[in-house]
Every structure is written in structure tokens, then in C-alpha cells.
């Protein structure tokens, strides 16, 4: 029984040390500031998702933000973003239902992505991808 308690204490200590190490690493990440200026009205909110290739167009991002619109514009910041490749997707959720609305397969609400690609089909990760290194980044995304 003493052996089991000793192993449990050692395991908890190990997990605690790992958790502290991970927190320390993520607190050294970069900030990504996103500005959207051409929002057609102040109804609803803007939803923003920071995505990896694995999450892009498959659900929520690895970091997600929601912002109220003031005077047709929004500025938000993703904080503590670790180095790597990402893409940002944004949408104007006019009816605040937290999802994109469609009619006949076409989006009813405005949307945009990092790098502002002009595409005639579903958004592609490669078109919106950017790299985070050792500097903060800023993006102006258009709907």
C-alpha cells in the first residue's frame, strides 16, 4: 500500500511539474492582432478562429474569440500563440446564433480569412496560412 501511495505522489508531482512547464512555454507566445473594418452593420457579433491545418474548416479553432461590432469595425488579439503555421477565419454572425447560416449551400453571412484570398469555392488552408515566429503579427481581414 505504501508503494501505491508513493507512486501516486510521484505521478502527481510529475504532472504538476509538466503543467508548470507547459504554462511557462505558452506564456512566451506571440500576439496576433486582427482588425476588420468593412463590416456592413453593427448587428450581432464577429466570430474569429485561429486554426491549424488539422482544425481548418472542421470545427472550432485552437483559439476562438467573439467580439461586438462598433462603427462597422472590430479589433481583437489572440494572445500567447506559439510558433507554427496557422490560418484565421472570421465571420459576421448577424443573428448571434454562433454559426454560419446557409441558403442553397451558399453562406448568408459575411466571412473572411487571413491573407484575404479571393476564392470561388470552399476556403483552402494553404491560401490563408501564415507563420508565427518570434514577432507579434497584425492582420487586416476583409469580408
Task: Give residue spans per PLM region.
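Short proline/glycine- and polar residue-rich coil/turn motifs
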Residues: 67-72, 131-133
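Short amphipathic beta-strand segments in non-cytosolic proteins
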Residues: 49-65
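A glycine-anchored, Pro-Gly-centered beta-turn/N-cap motif
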Residues: 72, 77, 82-85
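Acidic, glycine-anchored loop motifs typical of Ca2+
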Residues: 94-101
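Bacterial Sec-dependent N-terminal signal peptides
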Residues: 1-25
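Short loop/turn positions at the edges of beta-strands in beta-sheet-rich folds
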Residues: 40, 80-82, 94
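Primarily secretory-pathway and cell-envelope proteins
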Residues: 19-51, 102-143
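A short tyrosine-centered beta-strand micro-motif
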Residues: 86-90
Amino acid at each position: 500500500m505504501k508503494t501505491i501511495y508513493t507512486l501516486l505522489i510521484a505521478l502527481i508531482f510529475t504532472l504538476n511539474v509538466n503543467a508548470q512547464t507547459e504554462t511557462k512555454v505558452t506564456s512566451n507566445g506571440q500576439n496576433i492582432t486582427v482588425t476588420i473594418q468593412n463590416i456592413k452593420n453593427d448587428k450581432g457579433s464577429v466570430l474569429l478562429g485561429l486554426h491549424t491545418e488539422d482544425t481548418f474548416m472542421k470545427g472550432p479553432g485552437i483559439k476562438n474569440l467573439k467580439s461586438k461590432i462598433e462603427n462597422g469595425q472590430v479589433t481583437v488579439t489572440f494572445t500567447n500563440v506559439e510558433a507554427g503555421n496557422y490560418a484565421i477565419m472570421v465571420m459576421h454572425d448577424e443573428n448571434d446564433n454562433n454559426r454560419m447560416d446557409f441558403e442553397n449551400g451558399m453562406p448568408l453571412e459575411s466571412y473572411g480569412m487571413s491573407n484575404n484570398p479571393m476564392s470561388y469555392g470552399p476556403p483552402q488552408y494553404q491560401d490563408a496560412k501564415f507563420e508565427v515566429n518570434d514577432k507579434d503579427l497584425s492582420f487586416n481581414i476583409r469580408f
